[in-house]
Amino acid sequence: MELKDQLMQQIDRERLPQHIAIIMDGNGRWAKERGKQRLFGHQSAIQSVREVSEASAEIGVKYLTLYAFSTENWNRPLAEVSGLMSLLATTITKEVVTMNKNSIKLNAIGDLKSLPKANYDQLMQAIKDTSHNTRMTLTLALSYSGRWDLKQAAQRMAQDVAQGKLQPDAIDDAMISSYLSTYNMPDPELLVRTSGEERISNFLLWQLAYSELYFTPKYWPDFRKADLYEAILNDQHRERRFGKTSEQVTAK
């Protein structure tokens, strides 16, 4: 029996995180160690996206969110950004058939209108073409940052207050969450970051308040199903207390 199958059997399906978020990091360093250009690392990372998406859907995860391109990534060399946009367009178009086969719904969050028009149109078409799927929602965070998300939420709330649609004293945690780009999904129970870096890099700042954080030294292009299962098993050995004591959590 392969390691991934052994690990999958150990997972408690009753305590499975419903939402996993992943910071896919290390593509450039992975490529550099092999004497290749950074774009080669991004191209090689597509297989990791396929494996993790399939593995998540297979075991029953309902939401998978991947940090694909941050607002800060626009500052990278033009050749790399152009290559990433081209890769995004090609991959999304190719993967629609596979997503439909696995009943995976595609979603996207971020300042999507900042994407090149061709990329935006292809993304919207893929979202439409997979909208009927119900097994799992795969969300790509594109031109996204946590601060951008909070800013756009604050701007929209301020506008609604000014127009009399929202009372200031009605603004609580749930209300703020409803204005974020992730309004239609639960907060992640588990955040995974690859490449050995141990920070959240402006990703889902509000939504990660109570998430468990899992860091692995593996670069994203090397991340496979077994690695995802190890992250989930690690999470299942932790106790989420939300500010309470262990005794209170156990009593509940």
State what each model feature region is.
Residues 1-252:
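Flexible, compositionally biased loop and terminal segments
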